[in-house]
Regions:
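Signal peptide-proximal N-terminal region
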Residues: 1, 20-42, 132, 159-166
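Short beta-strand segments enriched in small/hydrophobic residues
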Residues: 1-17, 73-74, 136-142
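Glycine/serine-rich loop-strand microenvironments at binding/catalytic pocket rims
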Residues: 1-13, 86-87, 94-95, 100-101, ...
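Residues forming the Rossmann-fold NAD(P)(H) cofactor-binding site
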Residues: 3, 16, 80, 120, ...
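Beta-alpha junction/loop-to-helix N-cap segments that form part of ligand/metal-binding clefts
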Residues: 13-20, 32-102, 111, 172-180
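A general alpha-helical scaffold signature found inside nucleotide-binding enzyme cores
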Residues: 16-24, 117, 121
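Extracellular/periplasmic Venus flytrap/periplasmic-binding protein
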Residues: 56, 100, 107-181
């Protein structure tokens, strides 16, 4: 199986843990005899937090390394960059983290929560008496697909609950930004 997570660059701090989890799980399965008596072999590549490189590395895993499935990506932009490769080569991607929804591909197993399963319930709680009865909201995120789409969904939800635009602020930072002074 392929393991397609950034081990260097901006996303390494998050994705390295996913790589380690995949390897730990594979080791556990292999310690119990593997799958149908055969051990699973992990092929790990580093797309280095470089979105176009994700597609190149996915193609390498499928065509050169002959993996039957790939566990990988964190950001929506990395997932979207590999989708054409998985579709073209009819291979499987297991996408392990939350995502913005609004996408359904037969070659992807989405294992994380969508906004209606995570952000909406959290916002409902914040608006409840138990959650503090919030009436004003600040939507923020990194400037890419997941935060923008999730915040669009949250804004529509807040409007449906009577919250007006004057009580909603929205801000995005560039990817890799670290100076919040």
């Amino acid at each position: 199986v392929g393991v397609l997570h950034s081990l260097s660059g901006t996303m390494a701090i998050s994705e390295t843990a996913l790589k380690e989890t995949a390897l730990m799980t594979i080791a556990d399965i292999n310690s119990k005899g593997g799958v149908m008596g055969r051990p699973i072999e992990a092929v790990v590549v580093d797309p280095a937090s470089n979105w176009p490189l994700f597609a190149e590395k996915a193609r390498q895993l499928i065509t050169q390394e002959k993996v039957v499935a790939t566990f990988g990506c964190w950001t929506s932009v990395s997932r979207k960059s590999v989708l054409p490769v998985f579709k073209e080569l009819n291979s499987i991607l297991y996408y392990p983290v939350q995502y913005e929804g609004e996408e359904l591909e037969k070659n992807v197993f989405y294992t994380g929560a969508a906004p209606n399963q995570q952000a909406i319930p959290a916002t409902e709680y914040l608006m409840s008496k138990e959650g503090g009865g919030a009436k004003r909201f600040f939507l923020l995120g990194t400037d890419y697909v997941y935060p923008r789409t999730t915040n669009k969904i949250l804004r529509a939800f807040l409007h449906s609950k009577g919250v007006t635009d004057k009580d909603i602020q929205e801000t995005y930072t560039p990817f890799g930004h670290g100076d919040y002074q």
